[in-house]
Design a protein with these regions (language model features):
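Intrinsic-disorder/low-complexity regions
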Residues: 10-11, 39, 118, 129
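Short, Lys/Arg-enriched N-terminal segments with co-localized hydrophobic residues
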Residues: 1-12
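N-terminal export/targeting and maturation segments
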Residues: 30-116
Length: 213
């Protein structure tokens, strides 16, 4: 006749299976939870806004920043894309906007601002953050005002306009710092207990169009 496993062996097997199940739960928890932890200051803004934009947008707590507390949920595209703007800006700056896209295929956060460089001519600076790749892309275009604004993206033409008005890559860096670091990120740190700061972004890759101009 077959020998039945002793009670002690059966108890040991139960303990082993229980331990394995516990380890599996811990691994699954880590796999799910830790990737969602913000790796940088832009992750913080993106994730906290994603949590609140349909109920009571956290960015409404920024003084002088206008955004709907509850973003409309209709429309196939715009329902995922809250957008707000500052009412007051430093001198020579226009239309400072902060926007998002929470649709997974197009995930992003952006800061865009226009700066007047001459009558009828502006720089449009865009800083886009991709939460999937943890990358910030900084770029600029020239805007020529008219009945309808025209936008110049061609890099050679953009550089030509900048040279015409004596604007250097160092100047562009200072514009970025003044708006993104000293305005948007500083405001974020004033309403949220951030682990990061305007001088310490955290784990993020930065790509700057004008880096070698």
């Amino acid at each position: 006749s077959r020998l039945k496993p002793s009670g002690r062996i059966g108890d040991n097997m139960k303990k082993i299976f229980s331990l394995l199940a516990l380890v599996l739960l811990v691994v699954l928890f880590c796999f799910y939870f830790f990737p969602k932890q913000p790796k940088n200051i832009f992750d913080e803004i993106y994730q906290e806004t994603e949590k609140t934009y349909r109920s009571n947008n956290i960015l409404r707590n920024i003084d002088g920043f206008e955004i709907d507390d509850v973003w409309p949920s209709d429309g196939d595209y715009f329902k995922y894309s809250p957008l707000g703007k500052y009412k007051t800006l430093p001198e020579d700056y226009l239309e400072l906007r902060v926007g998002f896209n929470f649709e997974k295929a197009y995930s992003k956060m952006f800061v865009s601002v226009e700066r007047k460089i001459a009558d009828g001519t502006k720089i449009w600076m865009i800083s886009k953050y991709n939460p999937n790749t943890k990358t910030i892309t900084k770029s600029i275009q020239i805007v020529l005002s008219g009945k309808e604004d025209s936008y110049i993206e061609d890099e050679a033409q953009v550089k030509s306009y900048l040279e015409q008005y004596g604007i250097t890559a160092k100047d562009l860096d200072s514009y970025y710092d003044e708006i993104v670091n000293q305005k948007v990120l500083k405001d974020w740190c004033s309403i949220y207990d951030s682990k990061y700061s305007p001088s310490n972004y955290g784990d993020v890759k930065i790509e700057t169009q004008w880096e070698n101009w």
